[in-house]
């Protein structure tokens, strides 16, 4: 039994032709009847026999031919001779992999294909992939925005992001604390300069009071001339520490005093005092400097914020802001605010002046106002309506000087008026017809015709069967008055 099992294993364990390991009889039968096995058998018949099976060449060829003729190689008698190879051959076959790698030289395909450089990039990629020419992958340039924490795939995406409003808002949010710190530092420096100037003013007041005391003593007692000298020398020591404002007080001192040593002692001081004056004139102008940036013009604010407060338009760049400022809409809004152009602004009745004053500083200056366009002769109640009117086709055409287009109507006004007049005349002619004289006697016909013809009366020919006799139509005594005929309602 063991021998039979070993024979069965040898029968369907390995196919030397295809170098494939088989695990069952059914699998071996399917493989030997398959196209790939038969194709390789044909190749072996046409070509040379491998070296490993050279000793078994005649038997193998016979077995292959018989297997191909019979159809199934499992039932052939010559199959064991093909399969029963030496033990070394069996071990090598079992160790081999099902797919054998064919080494190809890694030479560039340019030498193999003469037209390689003129090929399409797709063909080049296929050839490079098949022939194993490895192209070093290019590193992608990572474009990122550190402020918004975003990565981009191309330069165009990055440019669009940098020009966008989200990036601008985040930039402003990061720059605003820096600007606040700078403004705080500037305010601290301004307070320091103010305190220094206040100390200087206090020292000048003390020196002036001392100088007045000295002049009084000089006028009263000339014997005590040494005392003013001492009093004058006392403030000379703080002059080294106190800045320039002491100079005018010192200049005032010597004039009332008659003592010559006072004039002779400070000839070296005025040069130092003049230098101190120049130095003090500069810090005096510093406190005004911080007040200037606080009052910024509208243009500077618009450039910083990229926003036009007059037209209420947000912009992504300075170039767009300049283009907006040079546009006709912005100019007309400016003219409306200033009242220089054809659009005049008037205060709205009921609006408070205080509210207007606060809004003039904050907004566009066009709130709580009504407007009148002199070109189009249109009154507008708000700023939004003014913008709509300025951007309308009617206003643009009037400004450009184009003639007004007539509104579409199926008929003209002249035709309508003429047709209505003709209809009225026809009705009057039909209604106002003179009564024939046959109804009236001869003496009254001439007198009654014009009076009766003025009033329309219905045609009674429909209701009368025969003509009325003349006795009914005789005039009554007194003034003649036309009577309306009776209306008879008859059934159908």
Swiss-Prot record:
One Pfam family cited in the UniProt record for this chain: zf-met
Family annotation (Gene3D superfamilies): Classic Zinc Finger (3.30.160.60)
Please give an example of a GO cellular component term from this record.
nucleus
Biological process terms from the Gene Ontology for this record are: intrinsic apoptotic signaling pathway by p53 class mediator
Zinc fingers classed as Matrin-type: ranges? 8-44, 143-173, 303-337, 371-401
Grouped into one coarse class, the protein's main location is: nucleus
State the residue spans of region: Disordered.
Answer: 159-206, 388-420
What Gene Ontology molecular function terms does this protein carry? Answer: nucleic acid binding; zinc ion binding
Q: Which keywords describe this protein according to UniProt?
A: Apoptosis, Metal-binding, Nucleus, Repeat, Zinc, Zinc-finger
* Composition bias type Low complexity, residue spans: 189-206
Q: Where in the cell is it found?
A: Nucleus
Q: Which InterPro entries match?
A: Matrin/U1-like-C_Znf_C2H2, Znf385, Znf_C2H2_sf, Znf_C2H2_type
What is the purpose of this protein? May play a role in p53/TP53-mediated apoptosis.
What is the protein name given in its UniProt record? Zinc finger protein 385B
């Amino acid at each position: 039994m063991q021998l039979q099992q070993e024979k069965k294993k040898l029968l369907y364990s390995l196919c030397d032709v295809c170098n494939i390991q088989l695990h069952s009889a059914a699998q071996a039968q399917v493989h030997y009847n398959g196209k790939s096995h038969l194709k390789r058998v044909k190749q072996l018949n046409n070509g040379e026999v491998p070296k490993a099976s050279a000793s078994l060449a005649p038997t193998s060829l016979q077995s292959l031919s018989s297997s191909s003729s019979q159809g199934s190689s499992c039932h052939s008698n010559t199959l064991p001779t093909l399969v029963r190879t030496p033990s070394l051959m069996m071990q090598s076959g079992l160790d081999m992999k099902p797919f054998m790698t064919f080494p190809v030289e890694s030479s560039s395909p340019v030498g193999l294909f003469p037209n390689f450089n003129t090929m399409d990039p797709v063909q080049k990629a296929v050839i490079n992939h098949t022939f194993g020419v490895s192209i070093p992958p290019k590193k992608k340039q990572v474009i990122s925005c550190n402020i918004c924490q975003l990565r981009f795939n191309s330069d165009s995406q990055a440019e669009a992001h940098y020009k966008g409003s989200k990036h601008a808002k985040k930039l402003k949010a990061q720059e605003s604390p820096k600007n606040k710190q700078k403004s705080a530092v500037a305010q601290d420096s301004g307070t320091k300069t103010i305190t220094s100037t206040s100390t200087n003013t206090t020292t000048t007041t003390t020196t002036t009071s001392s100088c007045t005391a000295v002049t009084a003593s000089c006028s009263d007692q000339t014997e005590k001339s040494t005392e003013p000298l001492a009093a004058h020398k006392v403030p000379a020591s703080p002059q080294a520490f106190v800045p320039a404002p002491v100079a005018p007080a010192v200049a005032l001192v010597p004039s009332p005093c008659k003592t010559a040593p006072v004039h002779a002692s400070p000839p070296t001081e005025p040069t130092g005092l003049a230098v101190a004056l120049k130095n003090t004139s500069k810090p005096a102008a510093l406190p005004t400097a911080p007040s200037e940036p606080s009052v910024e013009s509208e243009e500077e604010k618009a450039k910083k914020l990229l926003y036009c407060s007059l037209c209420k338009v947000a912009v992504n760049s300075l170039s767009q802001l300049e283009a907006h400022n040079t546009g006709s809409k912005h100019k007309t809004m400016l003219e409306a605010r200033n009242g220089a152009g054809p659009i005049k602004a008037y205060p709205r009745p009921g609006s408070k002046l205080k509210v207007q004053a606060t809004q003039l500083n904050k907004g566009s200056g066009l709130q709580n106002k009504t407007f009148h366009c002199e070109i189009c002769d249109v009154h507008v109640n708000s700023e939004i309506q003014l913008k709509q009117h300025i951007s309308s086709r009617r206003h643009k055409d009037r400004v450009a000087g184009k003639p007004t287009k007539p509104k579409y109507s199926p008929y003209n006004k002249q035709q309508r008026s003429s047709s209505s007049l003709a209809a009225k005349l026809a009705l009057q002619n039909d209604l106002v017809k003179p009564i024939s004289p046959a109804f009236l006697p001869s003496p009254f016909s001439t007198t009654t015709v014009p009076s009766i013809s003025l009033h329309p009366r219905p045609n009674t020919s429909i209701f009368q069967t025969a003509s009325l006799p003349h006795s009914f139509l005789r005039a009554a005594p007194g003034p003649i008055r036309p009577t309306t005929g009776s209306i008879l309602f008859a059934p159908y």
